[in-house]
UniProtKB/Swiss-Prot annotation:
It holds the Pfam family GHMP_kinases_N. This is 4-diphosphocytidyl-2-C-methyl-D-erythritol kinase. InterPro entries: GHMP_kinase_C_dom, GHMP_kinase_C_sf, GHMP_kinase_N_dom, IspE, Ribosomal_Su5_D2-typ_SF, Ribsml_uS5_D2-typ_fold_subgr. The keyword Ion transport does not apply. Pathway: Isoprenoid biosynthesis; isopentenyl diphosphate biosynthesis via DXP pathway; isopentenyl diphosphate from 1-deoxy-D-xylulose 5-phosphate: step 3/6. One of its GO terms (biological process) is terpenoid biosynthetic process. The keyword Electron transport does not apply. Catalyzes the phosphorylation of the position 2 hydroxy group of 4-diphosphocytidyl-2C-methyl-D-erythritol. ATP binds at residues 94-104. The gene is ispE. One of its GO terms (molecular function) is ATP binding. It comes from Bacillus cereus (strain AH187).
């Protein structure tokens, strides 16, 4: 038996870091929403007791460094599953881009194997298991639009923002999340107003959302990688309604309401950035079939 599962990317509309925790993680407060850029996973049951990861993308690890592998291993161990699984990952989300591609693959694996192996877990139980794999996995299990607190695993759902275009541009560099957090000086950065963002989203106020986007990690990543700041400036110059870096970078996204402007910005960015995408904001929650 085999199953196809979608794994959508996320962007942060607001991301704040409140401090460092005793467990070494950082306390965060952020708003994430899913977008219509997704990896596709094919899960195929194996008679042998093993986990196999397949992908044409050479940047996707095929061992336990892969979060989808970790998700399958976790379910096998927790629920004493003796069957195996082959997971084929068709990557569309750029790797190491600040878009939670790996976390979303893990979340899709949890949802898919729950069905394939007839585990009968609720979406809340899957999200709880996701937190054992990575900070963004819980959110990715649910999808939709939510405030994430703690280290990112405590999820509170809010309304879906008004529909718009999301233009993504990823420079050809990698950003180490650990280095970004390591260089973060909380008293020297601009903290976004996360609570105000919740209010404007719940009010369906598109202009308010555009005026309130913010990411406390931007200044740090910009100092380490000035080309990310240049992409943000260029996207603003082309006329996006709001521009922000997602996660710890290096991907920058712009929100755009009008189709004609979206095409202009997309074509303009293609001139000097290798990976550019124009997708819709999804913001809808996942359901278990």
């Amino acid at each position: 038996m085999k199953l196809l599962v979608k794994a959508p990317a996320k962007i942060n509309l607001s991301l704040d870091v409140l401090g460092k925790r005793q467990d070494g993680y950082h306390e965060v407060k952020m708003i994430m929403t899913t977008i219509d850029l997704a990896d596709r996973l094919e899960l195929m049951e194996l008679a042998e007791d093993r986990i196999e990861i397949l992908s044409h993308n050479r940047y996707v690890p095929d061992d336990q460094r892969n979060l989808a592998y970790q998700a399958a291993k976790l379910l096998k161990e927790k629920f004493n599953v003796k069957k195996g699984v082959s997971i084929t990952i068709e990557k569309t989300i750029p790797v190491a881009a600040g878009l939670a591609g790996g976390s979303s693959d893990a979340a899709a694996t949890l949802r898919g194997l729950n069905k394939l192996w007839n585990l009968g877990l609720t979406i809340d139980q899957l999200a709880e298991l996701g937190a054992e794999i990575g900070s963004d996995v819980s959110f990715c299990v649910y999808g939709g639009t939510a405030i994430a607190t703690g280290r990112g695993e405590q999820i509170e759902h809010i309304k879906t923002p008004p529909s718009c275009w999301v233009i993504l541009a990823k420079p050809h560099i990698g950003v180490s999340t650990a280095d970004v957090y390591g260089n973060l000086k909380l008293n020297r950065v601009t903290h976004p107003n996360v609570d105000k963002m919740v209010d404007v989203i719940n009010a369906g106020d598109y202009k308010g959302i555009c005026d309130t986007v913010g990411n406390v990690l931007e200044d740090v990543t910009f100092a380490m990688h000035p080309e990310v700041a240049r992409i943000k400036a260029q996207m603003k110059r082309f006329g996006a309604d709001a521009v922000l870096m997602s996660g710890s970078g290096p991907t920058v996204f712009g929100l755009v309401h009008h189709d004609s402007r979206m095409h202009r910005i997309y074509n303009g960015l293609k001139g000097f950035c290798e990976q550019v995408y124009a997708v819709r904001l999804l913001g809808e929650r996942e359901t278990l079939e």
